[in-house]
């Protein structure tokens, strides 16, 4: 389960970084594709993580007490309720990422900042997924 969590985190992070490639003319289509790939891979990993937690009934927990020690540390825990919402996020994010890759092609002429859109899309999906894993108040507020 830890591998799926880190895959989700890394995929969303790489999708966000790929958005920065979109500013160069030679990488516009590649950048859009990588943004969609990062979002799809991250959502798929989150979907799988949620499905495993629901299927097994075993919660996933990860704690970093040395980070933010005053608030009890950064604590992540995924129980059955959080897993349900992580699945809902994944089910909505995958088609949104795939549709968005084609939809944003019409905005390559510079009318809108596709770099910002791709960056914010992946970061939004990451933080929305991490909110479902928050195990204490400080972690919840940080992810919110």
Language model regions located:
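Transmembrane helix-loop-helix hairpins at membrane boundaries of multipass inner-membrane proteins
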Residues: 1-6, 17-119
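A generic hydrophobic-helix recognition signal that picks specific residues
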Residues: 5, 72, 129, 138-141
